[in-house]
Structures are given as structure tokens and as C-alpha cells.
Amino acid sequence: MKEFPKNYNFTENEKKWQQIWQEKQIYAYNPNAAKEETYVIDTPPPTVSGQLHIGHVYSYTQTDFIVRFQRMMGKNIFYPMGFDDNGLPTERLVEKQKQIKAYNMDRSEFIKICEEVVESEEEKFRSLFNQIALSVDWSLEYQTISPLSRKISQMSFLDLVQKEEIYRTNQPILWDPVDGTALAQADIEDKEKTSFMNYITFKTEQGDPLTIATTRPELLPACVAVFYHPDDGRYKHLAGKSAITPLFNEQVPLLTDPLVRQDKGTGLVMCCTFGDQTDITWWKTHNLPLKTIITKKGTIDFQHETSIDGLKIKEARTKIIDILKEQELLIKQEDITHTVKCAERSGAPLEILTVPQWFVKTISHKEELLKRANELNWHPKHMKIRLENWINAISWDWCISRQRYFGVPFPVWYSKRVGEEGKILYADVTQLPIDPLKDLPMGYSKEEVEPDYDVMDTWATSSVSPQLSTHGISDDFAVNKDRHDKLFPMDLRPQAHEIIRTWAFYTILKAHLHQNTLPWKNIMVSGWCLAEDRSKMSKSKGNVLVPEKLLEQYGSDVIRYWSANSKLGADTAYSEDVMKNGKRLVNKLWNAAKFVFIHFDKLKGEDKKASLLDIKEKITNEFDKWMVNKLVELVKLATNELQNYEYANAMHLTEKFFWVVLCDNYLEISKTRSYDEEHKNPQGQYSSILTLYHVMQTLLKLFAPFMPHITEELYQILYSENSIHVKGSWVNYSDLNYEINAKGAEGLLEILDIVRKFKAEKNLSIKTPIKLLEVSGIVLSAELTEDLKNVTSAEEIQFEMKDDKIKVNIIL
């Protein structure tokens, strides 16, 4: 008989098993397995944009719980890992890390530096993901900037061009003056900012004063009209007249529109090109002229005696207000707090500029997308409303152009040939991936074309993350159509709730447009990991937790235990107490396994190899049968919870069974029989050891998705040299049940609880002998009575049926 190791060293064992799993390819995907046997995950490719934090561990391990369960259930798992390593987030990381600015450098040199940085950063992710035991198949790894990903992303673009779902136009777009790029609606956030409502004097062309309230007086040079509500009786006399702008003396029409709020300001609103989306609506609806005064750098471009040319927006606002005051054209100012649209990443207030951009048709598909949201299986269900709210709020088509550098280029040129100047030239699919700055369209020379200098929004590539793994976009555009057809649509998209409006939405949109389908059957939405005081983690607060330190202190299994204690979709605070509970659980598992291990040499070899169903008749003791029935019930419940993506419920059920049913009760109650030092009851001894053997084996499998290292170590010591994590290793006891009256075993537990409380109240050892237990309300069988005697140290037990309520009298 082999020896049980004295101690469990999580540092050594976790490294050992991670290496063995890789070497033995325990998590390898089998491309030859049937489609119906395969379970496919659209793993979130982490953005290569900065420091790793505990939030990465939190969300990725929750996905891994489900993946490991599905593998153990017999599924052929396709579990890739990608890296979202292109676009603005990565550029900002590189600029910060290297103290450089992309616009001050040669484009190719900046891209080269980006490539070097992401390679280094991605290695950190790989190391962390291996340490936390993500059961990914690393041979399926992809990068969103790799040649293959660029090819598939450009295929997506060409497919949507072919389907007339993409267009290019010169229209107002949201512009980030700090990062110098157009943004999509999903890239912005509303921020509360303090400002002034400025009441300014305009005049009619007849010289009558008009008071207009505005927060943006610097846009006066771009004023193209003044509006009032058609039902506003105060201004009906202005119909058909014009207004004269202060300082700039431009004549603009006075018009009516129902979008004007009569209760805001004075009810007179100036329309400028452009201050907000309402300005755009009025500009289009009323066919107004375009006056552009704001540059891409967020400065004023307007030659005038006010000398605001070249000033930044805030500087120009201050100067205009000062001049208005000097000329007594500023009537008053009111302090206000209002919502300002800002760039999500740079934090800069956005401007609206008119720049040629590529757009994906979105608004026209809103109703179809709402139906898609309803077809999808949401886990948890309430997260669906977030997508529905976002779809209903969409008011812009998706702008996918970015005026940046490190991204997927548009496979596009513009002709300079005589007679076709400006004609859009698209790359042939056989040319992909292409860089229009280096490559040429078929049949054209360098002198005959102008490349598209923009790159795609990083979401334009991330939104085809399923297809980056399946290697296809549609029937017409695929690198490997057989692979794509086998893997798409996928089974699961795991992701965080804050990117439902971006990653989930865009991926659903793309799959709908490309193949008229959903990209996956299920979406599993995780919450945020918060600091211990339930505040959001941030570097400025100094409360960001670094995974490496926690791994060093507690090990991977304990951190995964903490993650498993959080309900799916819930925001959860980091908790030292939960970590300590996880550490206790690992230690208790080790000690419980050590206890049962010493008895296993008493079992016959064939009984160790047989299933619990096959040796059912050899478990003869009544309490053992009750224990097995409880185990079968646990397996059914935990399996059902995991099938419904409720990993936290499965973990809670399993842990509670382990601590209460097994450790607190069964081990203590069956201990005397398991040892049977006087050889009084060999059949009862064999029954208890066989029960322990299978209960422990089953619990290790139920814990395995959550704590893979300790369960693997114990499984190999106690049971098999094969991995506990291999395909098909889950337990199925659907046909197993002992026909017994559970009231007997449950009555034993109730009596035991009364005795334990009695001894605890009197500060007596649990082993303190009892002369007589007088029990009323139940009569136990001889087997249960013997077990009760052993566990309570009672010399004699007398039963009497007075009523159904159990009462115990203890005589020491």
C-alpha cells in the first residue's frame, strides 16, 4: 500500500499539475469528433491595455467552471484563448509605457513598437491564465492583429459591402480630440459636469432683442438658425423672420421645431453645426448650411476680430463670454450641472465633426436585433434587458473608422484615374490580408490610387471573435468553410455586463448580417469584482488587487473557490474571509481524504474498479444506504445547477454536503464501524468503507471544476492515475436508489444533534460516556441504534413511542 503524503504544498502541486496537464494534452480539442459532441466557447480575448488584476481571475475562472463541467460530462471542448491586441486601448498602453506619441513618429516604427509591447504583455496573460488553471487549448490561440485575424476581419468588411450593409459617407460623427479619432456611440459615456447656462442677446433683423440660453457660446460663429416650439405663443410673431447673431452679425433664420423644449432656458435655441445630436437633426430636417469651426485637435478655426482662432474649446468659451460681458450682451449666467458626452477611454468631452467615415447599418436593423436578443439564452436572465435598452437607445449607425495606426486596415483604395476620380476600389478576397499603404489593387499602379489611411474600430474585429476561431465569415468568405460550419454558431459567450452594449451587441449584429443567425446559443454574463469595501477598484484609490500576490499567498484553488462563491452576474467584493474559508476547505479535503485512505486497503480490487451501481448490494448498512441516497440527490442537484450555468449553487451544495453530511456526521457516525478494531461487524465495516470510497470519489469530481489541483492530487492518490478532468469523468447515478425509510437516519441525526448540544452546554467532551439515552418519538433499527451508541458513547439506548416529536433524556 502506498503512503499518503504528510502535507499538501499547493505551490509545488499546482505547478506540477499545470505542467502535466499541458504535457498530456488533457484539454486538447479533437477536430474529428462529431459536431453534436462538441461544446464551443467564444472566449473573451483580454484587451492588451494594462495591468492584470483580480477581475481577470474572477470572470475567467467562472467560465472555466462551466467548461470543465461540460468536458467531464463528455463534451469535446473547443476552448480557445485570444488576445485583443490592436486598436486604441493598445496604442494608449504603448504611448504611456514608452513615453511616445504615435502622431510624432513614423507610422511603421510605431506599429513595430506596438507589436513588441503586445508580445511581452500577452506572455503575462498566458502565465496568469495557466496559474489559475484555465483549461484552454493553447493550440487554438489567436491575436486580433495576426495576419489570419486581419484576413477574417477584412473578409467581414467585404462581405458586408457585398450585402450593402456598409457604406461610406461624409456626415457628422462623434470625435475625440484627445485621441484624434472618430468614435462609435458605444465608445462614449455620459459624465455629469458643472457649467453655466449663458443668457445672450440676439436681435431680430428689425433690431428687437431676443434672449437665447446656451452652454456653448463659443459655437456662436457656427450658428445657422434659431428655433422655437411651434406651440410657443411667446414667439409666434417671429414667424418668417431672421435673427442676427451677436459679435459675428450673421443673419440666420428663425424657425419652428417640436424638439424645442419650451421650459428650458428661454424657449429660444440656437442651432450650431454642431453642438449636439439635436443640431444634427435640425441641420438635416431643415436643410441648413454647414459651418465648421472646430478642428480635429479640438481648437477653433475661425478668423475674426474676436481672436478666438487657434484657441482650445474651453479657452474660446471663456474669451467669448468675456467679450459678451464687455459689450453688455450677456444678460446673466446660471450655475448648472448637466450631462456631457465624453470618450470612454480618454475621458475628453466629444465634439461633432463632419468627416468621411465607414458605417455599418444599425438603425434599420433594431427590430430584428431585439428579436435576436429574445432568441438568445441569457444567464442570468435579467441581463437581457441591458441589451434591449441599448438597442432601443441607438440613434447612430455604427461608425467603424478610426483615425489611428495599430489596427486592421480597410482593404480599400480610392482611384485617381482620369474619369473615375474618387471611385472606391476594394481588394479581392484572394489578396487578403492587405495593407493599402503597402499593397495595390489589382490592375492599378501606385500613382493611380490613394490608400485609405484609417483603421477599423477594434470592436469591428472583436465582434467577429467567434469567426476568428472558426476561420470563416459566411458561405462566400471563409478560410476553412468545413471548420466554420462545424463550430458556428458557438455554444457559449462568457463576458462581463459592462460590455453588453459593445461586444455582445456588435457580435450579434455581425452574425445577423453575415449569416442571419445568432453567434451563440447561450450568453453567460459575469459581474464586477469590487474592493473589500464594495467600491470599484482603481489605481488612484490604491485598492487594485494583484493576482500574483494572492496566488502566492493562497494558491489557485482558493482563489477559484472565492470566485465560485459569487453568484453569476452579481458584483462581488473581494473577501479575505472567503479566502480563508477556501483555505480551510482545501485543508479539510486533504485531511478527510487521509482518513478514508487508511481504510481503502481493506477493499477488494474488483470493488475499487466497479461503479457504485455495480456494487450496490455490497453496501448493506442502513445509514450507509441513506448516505448514498443523499449523495445521489446531491449529484442530481449539482448537475442541474451547472447545466443551468449556476456554478455558485452547485459549489454551495457540494461544500455543504462535504462539511455537514460527510465530515460532521457520516465520518463520525461510521468511524467505529470503519475501524472495527474488535472485528465485531466485518459486513458493516466493509459497507462503510465502500461507502466512504465512493462518496469521496464523487465529491472530488463535484469539486473538480472549481478546485482542479487539490482534486487531481487526491484523485490520483486515492483512485486512479488517469486525470480526474478527462472527458466523460462526471458521475451519473440516475438509476441508483436504495428503498429505505429515511426517517430512521434523519432521526439518528436529530438525536445526535441534541446530545452534542447537551455536552457542549456542559463543557463536556463529545467522547464523554453516557450511561443511558432515553429517546421518545422514534424507534431506530438495530443497525442505526448501534451507530448511535458508537457516536454518542452511550452504554444503553431505550426507545419509546409517545408521539412523533423526538425527545431525548440523557443520563451520564
From Swiss-Prot:
It holds the Pfam family Anticodon_1. A motif ('KMSKS' region) lies at residues 536-540. Keywords: Aminoacyl-tRNA synthetase, ATP-binding, Cytoplasm, Ligase, Nucleotide-binding, Protein biosynthesis. A motif ('HIGH' region) lies at residues 46-56. Its main location: cytoplasm. It is found in: Cytoplasm. It comes from the Bacteria. Gene3D superfamilies: HUPs (3.40.50.620), Isoleucyl-tRNA Synthetase, Domain 1 (1.10.730.10). Its EC number is 6.1.1.9. ATP binds at K539. It catalyses: tRNA(Val) + L-valine + ATP = L-valyl-tRNA(Val) + AMP + diphosphate. One of its GO terms (cellular component) is cytosol. InterPro entries: aa-tRNA-synth_I_CS (IPR001412), aa-tRNA-synth_Ia (IPR002300), Anticodon_Ia_Val (IPR033705), M/V/L/I-tRNA-synth_anticd-bd (IPR013155), Rossmann-like_a/b/a_fold (IPR014729), tRNAsynth_Ia_anticodon-bd (IPR009080), Val/Leu/Ile-tRNA-synth_edit (IPR009008), Valine-tRNA_ligase_type_2 (IPR022874). The keyword Aminoacyl-tRNA synthetase applies. One of its GO terms (molecular function) is aminoacyl-tRNA deacylase activity. The keyword Nucleotide-binding applies. It is an enzyme of class 6 (ligase). Belongs to the class-I aminoacyl-tRNA synthetase family. ValS type 2 subfamily. Monomer. ValRS has two distinct active sites: one for aminoacylation and one for editing. The misactivated threonine is translocated from the active site to the editing site. NCBIfam families: PRK13208.1, valS. This is Valine--tRNA ligase. It comes from Rickettsia conorii (strain ATCC VR-613 / Malish 7).
